[in-house]
Amino acid sequence: MENNSLAPLRVGILGFGGLGQAAARLLAPKQEMKLVAVADRHGYLYDADGIDVDNAVQAYTQQGSVGKAKKGQMSEQSIEDLIGEGEVDGYFLALPNLPNTFMADVTRQFIASGWQGVLVDALKRTSAVEQLITLREDLAQAGITYMTGCGATPGLLTAAAAIASQSFQEIHQVKITFGVGIANWEAYRATIREDIAHMPGYNVDKAQAMTDAEVAALLDQTNGILALEDMEHADDIMLELAGICHRDQVTVGGVVDTRNPKKPLSTHVKITGRTFEGKISSHTFTLGDETSMAANVCGPAFGYLKAGYGLHRQGLKGLFTAADVMPKFVR
């Protein structure tokens, strides 16, 4: 990976559903990053001069793939083909981790390809991050700096918990509660399936196998509300790896409204602990209700990509989490 420090980082996005499209639009006004590559399951698009986001979105929504866009290519091995063609400094893996091994499999593709640079994901499940941990040495040897768990939660709220923990001698509990409002669940099909997988009676395989009609029927039964408790969320292992607390002291739950863009409740993290004076107290960090899921996931992801690029230039390769590194603001 070679990039003049004064030139914008050349960025790719893998996955072009609701999250990937939001990420592309977020990058459009940025000066420090330039979107040059996108891929979906049926095709990819590479343009060293910068991708026309409107054209890419139109091709995806109207023709089913960015491969139909100007300069696009149809491919059933789009990730592999894109890695081989494009000069990209870092990729945001805006991919659904369905099945639960998918992100690790994609990571192995990058390792095997010989590509060097920065990868960032917004993974949710603890078990998915554990799979990446087993690839830590392989990533380092391949010359890849991988930033995992860098969305909203895990990610932004995990980092907030790591900072807030500094006030305490010991941490008693980290409680993350989120509210997500989505006007149209079909724009986030994979994300909703990942959330359904956390519900009682469901798992990743069952949620992945659901048809759109079955998902719609479930949402009809719940009036569009997904109430989630005691989720398997990688905030726990990330804070444990950072030495802040044991994973059993971290709880994550929330409410997703799939029929209303307004958040059903405020997203926040509450950190409770004991100070060195023996006082029990709590810090609470709350996200603004007007900030969308896309803003709170994609913004931190690119902030961590920028931070990861800094690590990469210093020769630091391998796996890092949102609790290990502060994100950098992307101008």
From Swiss-Prot:
It catalyses: (8S)-8-amino-7-oxononanoate + L-lysyl-[protein] + CO2 = (S)-2-amino-6-oxohexanoyl-[protein] + (7R,8S)-8-amino-7-(carboxyamino)nonanoate + 2 H(+); (8S)-8-amino-7-oxononanoate + L-lysyl-[protein] + NADPH + H(+) = N(6)-[(2S,3R)-2-amino-8-carboxyoctan-3-yl]-L-lysyl-[protein] + NADP(+) + H2O; N(6)-[(2S,3R)-2-amino-8-carboxyoctan-3-yl]-L-lysyl-[protein] + CO2 + NADP(+) + H2O = (S)-2-amino-6-oxohexanoyl-[protein] + (7R,8S)-8-amino-7-(carboxyamino)nonanoate + NADPH + 3 H(+); (8S)-8-amino-7-oxononanoate + L-lysyl-[protein] + NADH + H(+) = N(6)-[(2S,3R)-2-amino-8-carboxyoctan-3-yl]-L-lysyl-[protein] + NAD(+) + H2O. Pfam families: ELFV_dehydrog. Belongs to the BioU family. Has 2 domains; discontinuous domain I (residues 1-149 and 291-331) forms a nucleotide-binding domain while domain II (residues 150-290) binds substrate. The modification Allysine is found at K124. The active site is at K124, E194, H198. InterPro entries: BioU-like (IPR044262), Glu/Leu/Phe/Val/Trp_DH_C (IPR006096), NAD(P)-bd_dom_sf (IPR036291). In canonical biotin synthesis a pimeloyl-conjugate is transformed into biotin by the subsequent action of BioF, BioA, BioD and BioB. This enzyme replaces BioA and performs the first half-reaction of BioD. In Synechocystis BioD acts on the product of this enzyme. A 'suicide' enzyme that participates in biotin synthesis. Catalyzes the formation of (S)-8-amino-7-oxononanoate (DAN-carbamic acid) from (7R,8S)-8-amino-7-(carboxyamino)nonanoate (DAN), a function equivalent to the cannonical BioA reaction and the first half-reaction of BioD. The cellular requirement for biotin is thought be low enough that this single turnover enzyme supplies a sufficient amount of the cofactor. Disruption phenotype: Loss of biotin biosynthesis. GO terms for molecular function: NAD binding; NADP binding; oxidoreductase activity; transaminase activity. Keywords: Aminotransferase, Biotin biosynthesis, NAD, NADP, Nucleotide-binding, Transferase. Pathway: Cofactor biosynthesis; biotin biosynthesis. Its EC number is 2.6.1.121. This is (S)-8-amino-7-oxononanoate synthase BioU. NAD(+) binds at G15, F16, G17, G18, L19, Y60, A190, T191. GO terms for biological process: amino acid metabolic process; biotin biosynthetic process. Monomer. Changing K124 to A/R: No longer forms a BioU-DAN conjugate.
